[in-house]
A protein has these predicted regions:
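Basic, amphipathic alpha-helical/coil surface patches used to engage anionic, phosphate-bearing ligands
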Residues: 1-351
């Protein structure tokens, strides 16, 4: 605790943040930043001071994703429940996203909104979250190393030691090509938190290891429905409850919905957990109706058509073995706007 006390002393002259006066004085924050820099006080101080100024300028507690308000489903990433340890579980589906033409700015904004609100659901002793990435429906437009790098950079620099586990499923060699480009910038500890699984049996066992029956069953059904073609209206509009109460609810598992959606009080929204922006819009009846452009529709229907030979029938049905294509990586020709900046190529690895 000596280094924690030293870091706290070094931060004593920093003006407090509005609405979160104890952000950089509490033990949990100090320990997270020290762990992220392998207990080097100088490096932890630099990182924490940078984060304080970042929060001072961006005001993340009040951040909202206007992209989702302007185009419902712009991001599908949303909290859907908790794991057995009480960690918030985030689920994202490429098939459900209304566009795959994302930028670093809109992706970072949405991720920040989610993380800040997920923090409000964490119990005492919980500091990390779980992210499930369902790659069904992933198109070539979404294969953007620069986007992935930009998001991981912000998360690593300003939310260190927050990511507990990433489960990536239904991916194909195209995704692995993007992952290969990104992971060289990540700390080995971060890479170790990433689990890539294709086999339905394997990700079921993984879910059963970390989640209770309720969330496991919800995830398995959500994943199954998001592999359907065409995608049903209920799954496309994942922010709305199903027409029939007995049907699967794409907003999340029932315990999460009961506690954080059905009981949501807009008058206290600045102090409490806010679910996905479009779920909030659905509650107030303010979600806009936006149709998918013909260009995006063609891209969806063609699902990686340029590399269709890489997507087997087994992959489409979820029955592929993880042993198949484990080392298969597609070398993509990345357009300049999607490439990771050359100036970052020699940057230190992110933790």
């Amino acid at each position: 605790m000596e280094k924690v006390a030293e870091l706290r002393l070094r931060m004593s002259e920093v003006p407090p943040l509005e609405d979160e006066e104890d952000f950089f004085n509490n033990d949990q924050t100090l320990v997270r930043f020290l762990k992220a820099r392998e207990w080097n006080v100088d490096d932890a101080e630099m990182l924490l001071k940078s984060t304080v100024e970042h929060r001072r300028s961006t005001k993340p507690l009040h951040m909202d994703c206007h992209w989702c308000h302007e185009r419902p489903g712009h991001h599908s990433m949303r909290q859907v429940g908790f794991d057995e340890s009480g960690r918030p579980v985030i689920y994202s589906s490429f098939a459900q996203a209304s566009t795959h033409k994302n930028t670093v700015e809109d992706s970072v904004t949405h991720c920040t909104y989610l993380i800040e609100n997920a923090k409000r659901t964490m119990g005492i002793g919980t500091s990390t979250w779980v992210w499930i990435i369902d790659c069904s429906g992933m198109t070539l437009t979404a294969c953007n190393p620069k986007l992935g790098y930009g998001v991981t950079q912000v998360m690593s620099n300003h939310y260190p030691e927050r990511l507990g586990l990433v489960i990536c499923l239904n991916h194909n060699p195209v995704f692995q090509g993007v992952w290969k480009a990104i992971k060289v910038f990540l700390h080995p500890n971060t890479v170790a938190k990433m689990k890539l699984v294709r086999s339905k049996d394997k990700y079921l066992r993984l879910f059963q290891t970390y989640f209770d029956d309720e969330l496991t069953n919800w995830l398995m059904e959500e994943i199954r429905l998001n592999k359907s073609k065409p995608l049903s209206k209920t799954q496309i509009e994942f922010w709305n409850p199903p027409d029939e109460q007995s049907k699967h609810d794409p907003r999340g598992c029932s315990s999460y919905i009961t506690k954080f959606i059905d009981s949501f009080d807009r008058s206290h929204s600045s102090l409490t957990h806010r679910p996905h922006p479009n779920i909030l819009g659905s509650l107030s009846g303010t979600v806009r109706t936006v149709s998918m452009s013909s260009e995006e529709q063609r891209e969806r229907e063609g699902l990686l058509s340029e590399h269709s030979n890489l997507v087997t029938d087994q992959e489409k049905t979820g029955n592929i073995s993880d042993e198949d294509h484990d080392d298969s990586v597609v070398e993509l020709e990345i357009s300049p706007e999607f490439r990771i900046p050359v100036s970052e190529q020699s940057a230190s690895k992110l933790s």
